[in-house]
Amino acid sequence: MGLRSFLILTTLALASCGGGSPPAATKSAPPAPEDIAAGNTVPDEAEPPSAEPSETPAPAPAASNEANVAAPTSAHFQVGKNYTRLSPTQPTSSSPDKVEVAEIFWYGCPHCYALDPSVKSWIASKPEYVSFVRMPVVWSDVAKTHARAFYTAEALGKIGAMHDALFREIHDNRNLLDTEDKLAAFFGTFGVDLASFQSTYESAGVQTKVQRADELGRRYRVASVPTIVVNGKYVTDAGMAGGVEQLFALIGELAASEHSGK
């Protein structure tokens, strides 16, 4: 299936997850398109009574429309409506010669799961000057556990095989993977022995990356996922952009503008 097909299909199901609520115990209907445009909120039924309260992000630099600065996008997209500009520009994890496009996500978010096929199709055709990174959100205990799982899989060289599988296990198999023991068993199905998993999961390297993701999430003022941050400067999502197809068009314009300024 091509990128355009993925984009059209995903638009019908995509909104965003806010506050770190875990997936519902039973599969809920996708949000309607008007819910997406209304403000990127998760339907009430998607938040079970046992949902863990979200953590309030620490104060961070506010997003600014900077009306006195020429918009780097075409007339189709407006700063303050389709994307916001962070002021000052925030750090990235990519080399200076690259334009970083970061996807802020959570494995427990059904909308992140829905967007993932489109993200992968876009990665396959992105410009060479774009560096794509995934950054897990860290706004609750469950989200932090999933962030540690992401960086553990990355450190073990398993993220390529396990990224999709983590989404499927949580959403299709209804296994939240919210404890170290559950994750250890799951990693075992990918040939990772218990000792290797534990030493990596509890390592200083993984802890440092989780802390860095937490810091950047606060700096980027991430309030919902999936969120896209272009070069530490521009923040958008599918709801703001007007849909999934528009989201990737906007990412392309913002990235091209940043590249031309290097």
Regions found by a protein language model. Give the residues of each.
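Sec-dependent bacterial lipoprotein signal peptides
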Residues: 1-15
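C-terminal cap of thioredoxin/glutaredoxin-like
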Residues: 5, 19-44, 49, 190-262
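Extracytoplasmic thiol/disulfide redox context detector
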Residues: 8-9, 17-139, 261-262
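Structured loop/turn residues at beta-strand edges in well-structured enzyme cores
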Residues: 12, 128, 223
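Solvent-exposed, acidic/flexible segments
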Residues: 76, 94-98, 102, 108-115, ...
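Structural alpha/beta surface segment adjacent to cysteine/selenocysteine redox centers
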Residues: 103, 113-184, 253-258
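ABC transporter ATPase nucleotide-binding domain signature
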Residues: 187
